[in-house]
């Protein structure tokens, strides 16, 4: 009886999490006093508005200056202190978060066929195939069991919706239960892959908006980064695939700049380069995450999922114990289908991510890469790989095979001198993929010291 009551209460929590109650219009009047509050502009063209919920608080950061750093600078370098004294890492308020969300409010390319130029499509397809080869794992890892994936979550971090204000450590059993319930949504569609799974009708928990600041010298114009705080139940489902995938890439030395100190990695990578023949390129895409088109996200998900076995160790042991060969084969096919259905669900959520803003309003994006997913880094990396190869194919660039390295929106590659042009690359990306190349941050250079990769500058080639 006690277990039934607990299950009923847990079910009500899940229902409450996905059926958000309407509330009164938030009070947007500017408060009296000296502080000026900028009212957010909530009108969007492509981002879909959802039913509003309730307000919640967002941590905005600590003081503008660290007291110990301030004391040390005043004592030993007063001129430097006076130069940076007006700076801050504090993010902005709700209006700044809406400005960040607005970056996702743009036209999308849903499939490759929507690009009219056949030659451009062929170059994009070649770039995707190159990425598929580069990210292919010879030894594919097995996916995790549900309990193993829950154990991958960081217990001292926020649990997200619906456990607002709680750490994951306090609600681990509930997270596992909700993840299992979402996982069970796909099971009725695993027998026959011809049957369409209505994933858009599934009631899935929402992301919450968090914020992260960037250093700026003018505290009246703070730099703000919108953080998509994924619900723990979705993270637990993602971890079944993403966690073993990252570990496999570190071990098998694939094109991700992972597993070693970035400074050592890049120096070793550049050690055998003939500087008289090969130049270095590093591209920087403005608003990288928000400008990614959904057809590239789908291709990146396909590549990622194809590099993880559809079975956990636990599932394989279960199949091996089945009585007849026919039973084992049937369950084998069912598990493969479930792997594909889980990909459909997580891919849909990744592209069409719902987010609740601190003022209670909620929205659903239709393109771009959300920052809080387990898949964010690998999806960004695959797409970045495609961007660079695409620009090289469009120019007929001669590039060094197996030398392109990426991590998220950072990249470094070798090209033959005189065969690559940044202006042409910017034009091709803007015209055909609707993304903007930052000339200020992109580099075409002869020496490693002229590049900045993963935040490192290599003075004197080191």
Name these PLM-found stretches.
Residues 1-209:
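Non-catalytic, polymerase-adjacent accessory regions of viral genome-replication enzymes
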Residues 1-53, 64, 79, 197-462:
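Core nucleotidyl-transferase/polymerase catalytic module
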